[in-house]
Amino acid sequence: MYFHVTSRCDLTCQGCYSYKEGRNSCEDPSLECIKKALDEISSRGISQLVISGGEPFLRDDLPDIVAYAKEVCGIPSLAILSNGLHIDQSSLHRLSGHSPCISISFDGYSAESQAHIRGTQNFSKLVDSIKQIKSAGIQGHIIATIHALNIEDVLQYVTLSKRLGVTINFSLISFTSSDPHTAGLIPSPSQLYSLGGALFHLGSDSMAGPHGQTRLNISAKRYCGAAKNTLSIDSDGTVYPCHMLHEEKYAMGNVFIDSLANALDSDVARLFQQLDASRFETCSTCKYCEICGGGCRARSLCSSPTLAAPDPYCPLMIRFFELLEDETSRAFCAVE
């Protein structure tokens, strides 16, 4: 479950899933509204919460939100996504007793790296934020967005995470290729295929984290799980199938004025819950269909107007599962 507690942010990052015009003039939801939403989340037995934005640390009451989620609602796993520019000792001190994980987005593995996403390199500030987080006794985590211009930097990012003593996962940049300003950041099929191999060979230890999958996290599924295994609440209370599908036509309801149960019983929820990758274009003939689940439906909409279109990052997943299949076969042969 993603919960966007503010829409305000002082950055304009390429491919940001929460960017919208006028977001910095939008009023933050009240603490009372947020508590109501957290009560709804808790009532559904949701065990993992990601507090996002905007930039959550722009809210002075962020520690109060975390305390309510953890101590009153009993949500066991909580992560805060941050751009890392507003981490302060006072907030960290108030957060430290509630065991959150604070994930900092990096746009480069060194101070000399070009900031393709943010436009301005803040590497030293981000490293300092990670160190402050760890000094406060809070789990730190790095999120690096992979795109065409840094796809060869995966190992350097892993080295950085090990040097700082934190976990890491990688997100994949996603937006339409029709925008001439961002089209150059979209990886080619061959780059994605190579990336699938690189991520597989990193192994489960280096990829373990609160948001990232490991090579052992494999299960059968019909689709990506949007509106069923994942949900996202916008800063105005609107519920969407996932954090990358904040579009009006996919609004499921509003937890500030209604229940989460009603949102999960909406027409939009049923639309997603009836998706089946075995009926998706190209997926039906793929031997990895039942463990891939057709990839990400939000990414499919970046290249096509239909939810049943192929995920444009399919080459990455094919390579990953090819290597998984090979390794599994070798393991069984060794046992025999």
Give residue spans per PLM region.
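Conserved alpha-helical substructure of the radical SAM core
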Residues: 1-98
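Residues that scaffold the ATP/ADP-binding catalytic core of kinase and kinase-like folds
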Residues: 12, 16, 90, 112-113, ...
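Short glycine-enriched, charge-decorated loop/helix-capping segments at active-site entrances
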Residues: 20-28, 115-122, 184-185, 301-302
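Short secondary-structure capping/turn micro-motifs that flank functional sites
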Residues: 22, 57-58, 86-87, 149-150, ...
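Residue-level signal for the nucleotide or nucleotide-sugar donor/cofactor binding architecture
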Residues: 29, 60, 121, 149-152, ...
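Radical SAM enzyme [4Fe-4S]-AdoMet core and its adjacent flexible, acidic
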Residues: 93-100, 105-239, 244-255
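Flexible mid-to-C-terminal extensions adjoining Fe-S/redox cofactors in radical SAM and related proteins
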Residues: 245-336
